[in-house]
Structure formats: C-alpha cells, structure tokens
Amino acid sequence: MAAPSSLASSSHLSRRATAAASPSIPPPSPPPPPQRLRCGWVGRAAPPTRRAPGVCSVVSPSKPGVAAVDVPAATIPDAAATGVGVAERISVSSLLEVVADDLLKLNNNLKSLVGAENPVLVSAAEQIFGAGGKRLRPALVFLVSRATAELAGLLELTTEHQRLAEIIEMIHTASLIHDDVIDDSGMRRGKETIHQLYGTRVAVLAGDFMFAQSSWFLANLENIEVIKLISQVIKDFASGEIKQASTLFDCDITLDDYLLKSYYKTASLIAASTRSAAIFSGVSTAICEQMYEYGRNLGLSFQVVDDILDFTQSAEQLGKPAGSDLAKGNLTAPVIFALQDEPQLREIIDSEFSETNSLATAIELVHRSGGIKRAHELAREKGEIAIQSLQCLPRSEFRSTLENMVKYNLERID
C-alpha cells in the first residue's frame, strides 16, 4: 500500500464531495435472510461453505490520504437516512452488542498472546489491556467480517478473522505505549502510563515486543496481501510521528498536511484492518476496496473529533490536560482553521506560549474563530463518505452497527 502523496484541500468542505466521473453505488439485490453468526470458529481443515458472492458497482480508491472516493452530493445520506444528527444517543455497550461474544473471546486471548516469558512485559500488558479501552478497532474487524461473511455466504467466521482482531489490538496497544513515551504523557484512560510505572526503557521495549509479537502472528496468517497491508501500518505509525515532530509550532501547516499525518497515525490501521477482514471473508476486490474506504474515512473522522475534544472537554473527561496538543505545538484541525481568521493566534503560537496565560488566550481564539465548528463539519463529511462506502453490503445488523459507529463518533462532540 503506497503512502498517500496528496490530500483534498480545505475547499473540499464547501462542495460536500462533488462527483467525479464515477457512478453512484447502486443498492445490492436483496440477500437471502441472514443467519445470526456467533463464535463458531473453523480452521484450515474445515473450509467455509459459500453461496455465490454478491456484486456491487464501486469507485476504486486512488490515494489513501483523504478523499479517494468522490461521492456525488445527491448520494450522500442525510441525517434521517444515516442516523447522524438524530437525538437518541448511542452507548458503547449497545453499539458493540452484536459482536459482544467475539470481543469477550478476544479479551480472554489477549494477555496469553503476549506470552509469560518476561514478568515485566506481562505486567505491562495487564496494565494496558486492562485500562478500560473500548476495543473499537477489533470490534470493527468483527463487524466487517460478519457483514461481508453474510454477503459472501460464509456460514461461520474463521480463525483468521479472530486472529486478525487480536493482532490489530496488539498493534494499537504497542502504538499507544510508544505515543505516551514520545508525548511524555502521564495518564492513559485515567491510569498511569507504562513509562510512568516502569520507566522509559521498559516502555519502549514493551512496545517493541508487542509490535514484534503481532508481526509473528501476522506472518502465521499466511496471506501475503494482509501481511503487506498491516506491515505498512507499522511503517505509517513512524511516518506519522516524524511528520508531527517536524511540524510542531508550524503555523504554515496545511489541512492536507494534517490529514496526511492523521491518516498515518490513526486511519491507516483502521483502513487496513477493515479491508483485511473483508479479504478473509473472500469477497470481491471491489468490496474489499470499499471496506478500506470505510475504515479510512471513519479513522479520519475519529481523529478530527479527538482533536476537537482537546478544546471542548475537561481534563477529567479527557484523562489528560485540556489543550495539551496545542500546548506541545501539535496544530490540529480546529487550530488550522482558526489560523485563517485570527492573526493574533499565529503570533502566540510562534512565541511557543512564552508569555503568561498565552495558552488560554490561544484556546479562546480557537473557540471564537469558528475553528471548532469547521472541524466538526470536516468530521461529519468524512463520516458521511464512510457510510456511503457501506452501500455495497446487504442490510443487516452488522452494517447498521457500522453506520452507527459514525453516529457514535460524531455524538462525542455534542
């Protein structure tokens, strides 16, 4: 998977993803009544039973950075159709109920996958795996696996689907450990970080170990396409950190730069995992590409929302100091939009907050400028494109939950 080289500019917000020459995605033919799939794992010795795979017309992705799928404005679902903007809020527990059994099995397996050779690593794994994470990334693997399994006529999920979800969570966990070291973060999900408890050396080694262990399990999946996809993600993590470090306090950073960094650090893993889940279901390449587009745009939307929350939530809600990204010089979407209208904000950031209360003034300018509102529009736009990518799937509780994942993300701002 080649790293993206260019992204849609901020003017993309004003035109709501206008159409390229590509056709809109037609709805699939009504599928046979789906069977409720639960944890009946089958191995290589028991090949899955299939019906004839479904077919849908799709737009192939071009570059993974921003808008590889140009969707005609008329085909983007409105709030009534998608649930985005509807008053009823979604809880995490209700959102993930349809894959609760899958996640329970995953939770039971995670600690054993780390191994018991080193007590310090085991203790670090227990700390991070038990820190109250939502397991959204493996949940997305299970949701796409089950949605595409219904489309392909796969009667049961495979051990590859299960192991993929475990690998994705291990990679995500390793990246969090390293992120906390790089950012010198003292808290993660309301608990002390690994490097605070065990020191930087152990934290770095623990993250390295999890990357290595996940790579070993990945190789044992024996699917070269998936191995390439997930291996690229680990490279993207490093690229994202380097890009972020090279643009600290840089008021000339563009929205394209920000979205590329966000792809590397967040969306790459989600996009690769949703595409890999579809690959293991055995659906067509076109559908696998749409699952990639879903994951990529959902990942970008999630990152933009996270960056908005850094300005709108308290330290208690965030589990870290509010405005911490800005304080460290990491300029995110709300700041990039605000810089277009607030010259004083540039002066304050250029000074690296050297004067008393300058950070508080900068945060106030971001709020006053409308930067948060424009960032919200960006997050919503990416979410709508993600939902559009699901139209080649048959209607099911799993597709509905994938759509509701977009709604849940946007509700975090309200």
Swiss-Prot record:
Do you know which SUPFAM superfamilies this protein is assigned to?
Answer: Terpenoid synthases
**Organelle transit peptide:** 1-72
Keyword Transferase assigned: yes
Q: Which cofactor does it need?
A: Mg(2+)
Keyword Plastid in the entry? The reply is yes
Residue spans of biased composition, Low complexity class? 1-23
Describe the task this protein carries out. Answer: Involved in providing solanesyl diphosphate for plastoquinone-9 (PQ-9) formation.
The Swiss-Prot or TrEMBL record describes its family as follows: Belongs to the FPP/GGPP synthase family.
Protein name (database record): Probable solanesyl-diphosphate synthase 3, chloroplastic
| Organism this protein belongs to | Oryza sativa subsp. japonica
